[in-house]
């Protein structure tokens, strides 16, 4: 998304139109595409890591793909015919459009693209023999080794705050499960739902609880806190943990409705000057679209 933003902005300026709506379309397009594979967005990979910590076999690279395709299709239709009409063009032009651009280094660009494609193919072909994080590190070493990026640039590119957050929340998620706190919260939710709740009802409640938390807490923390609870609920009602885990993964990635739901949302706010209420207008209906896809496809691809 960051790589595409200058191109989209330049196209809008050349066409004589404001770039804000186009940049918001780029944000939503990136979010829709992130649902298609396990590495499409960071929260998907985080969910897999938490599942491993909880002793559950993680999802495969394309396990999320049927749901992602459904969200892409319905989301694109919604945004094309309804969503983009709900908000105005702010007329703001981001700062990067006003600065001089460096000429493209074709060698570095070619190496970067080829390395990315190779890493993705290795992950997709043999996720058991080549874990995702190992393939990613090898790809990063190739980029640095071929001088596409210096060591200093690579270090600066790491979001250390995010690394610390994920590391600490991984411990909290495991502690939630091992200490029994996840089971206690799961029991409380089941008491609220009443005796013998249907898997559909449980899925619905978990989806909206995780999705709402995501809008204010960001997607990765939401998934890491909810997965132990969701898996405990699945165990207590005697169903497979996979439909519940997939529901939480998709709900956590549905970071549409507030600027705080994902880092790329905050980045887009800086580029467009859209407000909190603008994200709510366009994002809340998209949450319902995502729920429809989840509720429809979970019983088909991940039966309870």
Residue ranges and their predicted role:
Residues 63-187, 203, 286-287, 291, ...:
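Hydrophobic transmembrane alpha-helices of multi-pass small-molecule transporters
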Residues 11, 31, 50, 54, ...:
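Alpha-helical transmembrane segments of multipass membrane proteins
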Residues 1, 68-73, 129-140, 188-202, ...:
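Structural signature of hydrophobic alpha-helical transmembrane segments
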């Amino acid at each position: 998304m960051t790589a595409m933003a200058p191109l989209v902005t330049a196209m809008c300026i050349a066409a004589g139109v404001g770039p804000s709506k186009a940049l918001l379309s780029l944000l939503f397009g990136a979010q829709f595409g992130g649902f298609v594979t396990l590495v499409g967005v960071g929260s998907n990979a985080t969910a897999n890591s938490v599942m491993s910590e909880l002793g559950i076999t993680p999802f495969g690279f394309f396990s999320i793909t049927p749901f992602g395709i459904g969200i892409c299709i319905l989301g694109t239709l919604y945004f094309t015919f309804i969503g983009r009409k709900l908000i105005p063009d702010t007329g703001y032009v981001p700062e990067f459009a006003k600065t001089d651009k460096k000429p493209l280094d074709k060698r570095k660009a070619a190496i970067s693209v080829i390395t990315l494609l190779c890493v993705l193919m290795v992950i997709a072909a043999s996720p058991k023999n080549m874990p995702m994080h190992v393939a990613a590190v090898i790809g990063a070493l190739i980029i640095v080794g071929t001088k596409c990026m210096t060591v200093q640039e690579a270090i600066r590119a790491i979001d250390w705050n995010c690394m610390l957050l994920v590391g600490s929340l991984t411990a909290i998620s495991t502690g939630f499960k091992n200490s029994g706190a996840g089971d206690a919260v799961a029991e409380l939710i089941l008491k609220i739902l009443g005796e013998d709740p249907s898997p559909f009802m449980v899925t619905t409640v978990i989806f909206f609880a995780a999705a709402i938390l995501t809008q204010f807490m960001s997607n990765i923390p939401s998934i890491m806190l909810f997965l132990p609870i969701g898996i405990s609920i699945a165990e207590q009602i005697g169903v497979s943990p996979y439909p519940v885990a997939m529901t939480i993964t998709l709900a956590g990635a549905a970071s549409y409705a507030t600027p705080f739901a994902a880092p790329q949302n905050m980045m887009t706010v800086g580029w467009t000057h859209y407000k909190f209420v603008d994200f709510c207008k366009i994002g809340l209906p998209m949450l319902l679209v995502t729920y429809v896809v989840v509720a429809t496809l979970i019983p088909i691809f991940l039966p309870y």
